[in-house]
Amino acid sequence: SYMFYLKISPVRMQIKVVSKKADISNHLDKIQEAIRREQDERCKVLLMDYYNLIRRIGLKEAVTRRFFIVFAYEPIPGSSKKNEEKDAVNQLEIAERTARTYLMQCGNNVVEHENPDSFMAEVLYMLLNRKTSTETPFSARAAAEVEKYIAEGDANAIPISAFLLPEQMDFGKAAYCRIDGLYYSYFMIPSTGYKTQVTAGWLSLLVNAGEGIDVDLFLSKEPKEKIQFQLGRQIRINRSKMKETSDTNTDFDDIDSAVRAGYYLKDGLANNQDFYYINTLITITADSREELEWRTNEMKKLMLSQDLILKP
């Protein structure tokens, strides 16, 4: 299960979910080709109905999602920096193979790439150029930049930013920013914004929120001994507060809830579970400011209906 993987996963990890409008043009082209080759007029009518259905759904509802797991290099304390790059590559490759093995055991399909460097460059380009990347692939952008620098006689000094950075970035507004012609707003779920009890699969609400809604989960594993010590101290402090507080006081329920939560975490650690901090970042994108405001309001309503709070 995923719990077994979390026991041996890196200390810091990011799970990124990117949702964007699905490209159904290739599928529609195949249907049109089938209509042209079909001899039976009745079958042509059925194929045409199917074509219109796919086109109608694609314009409104078709969304494609990509799931990424991101690892950060964790240098070993006291290690030499002489071979730091080599050590980082080895550590990250081991983390990737381990994650791939455990995810496949859980029934997930993990996409493999012949050239990992090219794949990562394309992903970074897509994330920074959400709009341009749908029209100009990374290979075309890279070729154009190389050709430009060669023409200028400076082919050996091409910065990495020339291949990845968007042509337009505007951070002049507090409520949103504009990158590559798209409007972005960023929100988070504060520590008090989660439900106290959730069912399995509660994150599907965020993952399936719709086009233009990205979710980032940042996980950080804490040393078990450190957390056990902090929990024990905080439980003792809260129990002392309870003795000094009347059960009719409004603070009594909050303190009682904190004590019970502390014991819940303590029992989990005693049963060989690990303690993780999790931060949830939600990114909303749109083609216009009006559409961004509408998506933001709808997302806040959706979260509120599930007792979740969204903060900028």
Predicted regions and their residues:
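Extended, folded cores of ATP/NTP-driven motor/assembly subunits in large transport
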Residues: 1-312
